[in-house]
């Protein structure tokens, strides 16, 4: 089953920080943009605590806290698809986390925070290769690879967003 990600620039919230989220089975990587939404930087790695059938746990609480404390205007959750665009069980986990973030934002009165799904094919592979190439040990790499993947997800989104916004024709 082909799974479609959101398109950067659609219903764009304008200037402000973005949060990139890489949902793994063990950890969740977070990356944050600058306020001009041009550059993604590693932010934090969380232990993944909330399962598909659980109520929200500390991982979702922490993501909500990061969003509110940093005045995030858009959250970009990686949508893990294979090279043909098909989804897997990982897609369910990513969509579940996105749903929980969206629900929490509404509950907290932060409905203006957009939660989008971005194509994340091969981001963990690219992040792992980049860490190895920069001399990061395998042990340390395990702790930061999720943040690095979140940076890849968010930076790809930011670059595509800028491209879309700069090439839009004004009627």
Curated annotation (Swiss-Prot):
Keywords: Cytoplasm, Hydrolase, Nuclease, Ribosome biogenesis
Compartments, record wording: Cytoplasm
InterPro entries assigned to the protein according to its UniProt record, in alphabetical order: RNaseH-like_sf (IPR012337), YqgF (IPR005227), YqgF/RNaseH-like_dom (IPR006641), YqgF/RNaseH-like_dom_sf (IPR037027)
Entry keyword annotation includes Cytoplasm: yes
Family statement drawn from the similarity comment of this UniProt entry: Belongs to the YqgF nuclease family.
Alphabetical list of PANTHER family matching this protein: POLYNUCLEOTIDYL TRANSFERASE, RIBONUCLEASE H-LIKE SUPERFAMILY PROTEIN
Stated name of the protein: Putative pre-16S rRNA nuclease
UniProt organism field: Corynebacterium diphtheriae (strain ATCC 700971 / NCTC 13129 / Biotype gravis)
């Amino acid at each position: 089953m082909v799974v479609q990600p959101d398109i950067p620039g659609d219903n764009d919230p304008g200037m402000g920080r973005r949060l990139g989220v890489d949902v793994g089975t063990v950890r969740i990587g977070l990356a944050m943009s600058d306020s001009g939404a041009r550059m993604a930087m590693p932010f934090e790695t969380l232990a993944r605590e909330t399962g598909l059938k659980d109520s929200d746990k500390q991982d979702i609480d922490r993501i909500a806290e990061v969003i509110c404390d940093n005045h995030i205007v858009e959250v970009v959750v990686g949508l893990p698809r294979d090279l043909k665009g098909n989804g897997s069980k990982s897609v369910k986990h990513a969509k579940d986390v996105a749903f929980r973030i969206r629900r929490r934002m509404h509950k907290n009165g932060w409905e203006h925070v957009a939660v989008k799904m971005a194509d994340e094919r091969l981001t963990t592979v690219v992040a792992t290769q980049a860490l190895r190439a920069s001399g990061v040990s395998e042990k340390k790499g395990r702790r930061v690879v999720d943040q690095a993947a979140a940076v890849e997800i968010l930076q790809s989104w930011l670059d595509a967003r800028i491209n879309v916004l700069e090439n839009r024709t004004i009627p």
